[in-house]
UniProtKB/Swiss-Prot annotation:
Coiled coil: none annotated. It comes from the Bacteria. Belongs to the class II fructose-bisphosphate aldolase family. It comes from Streptococcus pyogenes serotype M1. This is Fructose-bisphosphate aldolase.
Length: 293
């Protein structure tokens, strides 16, 4: 299947009691790993770029072209959306212009009324081009690419107002954070999520900071209405651990590769990319989106 907008497969997840993964990419190899995992599991997927990752990779146009061409060259058959994660207003508009099929406008740092007004503007522009829109109420805790939030519970009335702007799925604070979870983290506020989904019945909720949340809490959140789960830190840790292990065992690895010098970056990066693919496949299984393409 070609590159698609995300609203239909996210809504299908909401209606059928599973969640799709929004997996952040950082380069060519990560993109390949995510696509291989999605294809192996026959799962719809959003490949996401943060503003920082897109800058690192050469800009939004480069990211869009890279993902689009890899989907074609790798023969990917599952639905793939190209998604902007936590984008400012100008970034959201640029992504719509260069061919992203899904965007998140994050105006959660703005006063509520301004957030709602700007989101409505983004929705109008995006939907005119067939691009799905995610927006946020209630700051997601932690830090990601310089965006820092204390973490809070999204006000129910704000969530209802945000849904009325015409967005396709809603990121809402329910005690979740970006990055590794501290030992004293109290867990997801599932009771608040239940109230939230009751206020916007049938509407897809997005769980940010999906890395490190216990699987039982993720599954319960999905049962209550979460239809998209974002994953980044988990993939980064998997990549880092595998690469460090490879470097520690350099001589043994060199023998395994028939004595070839391992300064070739393709060999050096391979274990980390395999680990990312494995991490993505494992999350797809937990989210229940395998064989839902």
């Amino acid at each position: 299947m070609a590159i698609v907008s995300a609203e239909k497969f996210v809504q299908a997840a909401r209606e059928n009691g599973y969640a799709v993964g929004g997996f952040n990419t950082n380069n060519l190899e990560w993109t390949q790993a995510i696509l291989r995992a999605a294809e192996a599991k026959q799962a719809p997927v959003l490949i996401q770029t943060s503003m920082g990752a897109a800058k690192y990779m050469g800009g939004y146009k480069v990211c869009q072209s890279l993902i689009t061409n890899l989907v074609e060259s790798m023969g990917i058959t599952v639905p793939v959306a190209i998604h902007l994660d936590h984008g400012h207003y100008e970034d959201a508009l640029e992504c719509i212009e260069v061919g992203y099929t899904s965007i998140m406008f994050d105006g959660s740092h703005l006063p509520v009324e301004e957030n709602l007004a700007k989101t409505a503007e983004v929705v109008k522009i995006a939907h005119a081009k067939g691009v799905s829109v995610e927006a946020e109420v209630g700051t997601i805790g932690g830090e990601e690419d310089g965006i820092i939030g204390k973490g809070e519970l999204a006000p129910i009335e704000d969530a209802k107002a945000m849904v009325e702007t015409g967005i396709d799925f809603l990121a809402a604070g329910i005690g979740n954070i970006h990055g590794p979870y501290p030992e004293n983290w109290e867990g997801l506020a599932l009771d608040h999520l239940e109230k939230l989904t009751a206020a916007v019945p049938g509407f897809p909720i997005v769980l940010h900071g999906g890395s490190g949340i216990p699987d039982d809490q993720i599954k319960e959140a999905i049962r209550l209405g979460v239809a998209k789960v974002n994953v980044n830190t988990e993939s980064q840790i998997a990549f880092s651990n595998a690469t460090r292990e490879f470097a520690r065992n350099y001589e043994a690895n060199e023998a395994e590769y028939d004595g070839k010098k391992l300064f070739d970056p393709r060999k050096f990066l391979a274990p980390g990319m395999k680990a990312v693919q494995g991490a993505v496949e494992e999350r797809i299984d937990v989210f229940g989106s395998a064989n839902k393409a």
